[in-house]
């Protein structure tokens, strides 16, 4: 966060100092030595939760990507690129050996990873090959707006589909998380701006309004979880 503020808001030395301090702490304690990032640590750096969650990896990549941009450090850039490579290797099984699901029974594709990759690609744009970046952005847009976005359900976004992108008639297949979808539309709008595609921004805006209406608690206000 402090790296991003330094890069995009104001070149304040105290922000950069905080970012470097946090980056050095994570570099020393945040992973197992092979850039498998623990989910949480105590204040002394001892791991509390194993690296079962791929979002530990995505946020570490964002952090070191922005820190490399702020400092010009090749070491931080290499950490971000190595971690990003691990993320891509885990796309088909994000939880790896910590996956609790019985294999071969109900294989589902989850919305969370392609959604966060939309954001991650832009956050580390300066570290990626332009051709690869273009391909990644298009793949993420396709996954979010062609696979998980369901016009046959009134234009809402579902959390899980089968491995072929079809709806699944089960609890997980019927799950809708409005706030998650709205967050994803923010990322899609950013991609629309980056790619100069106003029609994509418009589609994301309309989907945001649809999800707000679908998920709104009309009695008490607020968005259902």
What label would you give each PLM region?
Residues 1-225:
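Glycan-recognition and catalytic cores of secretory/periplasmic carbohydrate-active enzymes
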């Amino acid at each position: 966060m402090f790296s991003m503020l330094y890069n995009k808001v104001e070149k304040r030395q105290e922000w950069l100092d905080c970012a470097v301090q946090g980056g050095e702490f994570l570099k020393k304690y945040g992973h197992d030595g092979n850039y498998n990032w623990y989910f949480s640590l105590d204040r002394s750096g001892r791991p509390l939760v194993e690296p079962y969650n791929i979002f530990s990896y995505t946020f570490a990549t964002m952090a070191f990507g922005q820190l490399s941009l702020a400092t010009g450090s090749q070491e931080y850039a290499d950490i971000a690129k190595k971690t990003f490579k691990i993320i891509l290797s885990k796309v088909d099984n994000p939880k790896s050996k910590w996956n609790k699901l019985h294999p071969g029974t109900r294989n589902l594709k989850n919305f969370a990873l392609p959604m966060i990759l939309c954001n991650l690609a832009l956050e580390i744009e300066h570290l990626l090959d332009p051709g690869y970046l273009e391909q990644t952005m298009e793949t993420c847009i396709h996954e979010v707006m062609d696979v998980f976005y369901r016009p046959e359900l009134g234009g809402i976004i579902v959390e899980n589909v089968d491995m072929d992108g079809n709806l699944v008639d089960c609890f997980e297949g019927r799950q809708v998380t409005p706030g998650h979808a709205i967050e994803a539309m923010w990322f899609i709008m950013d991609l629309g701006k980056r790619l100069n595609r106003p029609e994509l921004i418009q589609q994301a805006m309309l989907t945001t309004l649809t999800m707000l209406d679908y998920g709104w608690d009309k009695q008490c206000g607020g968005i259902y979880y």
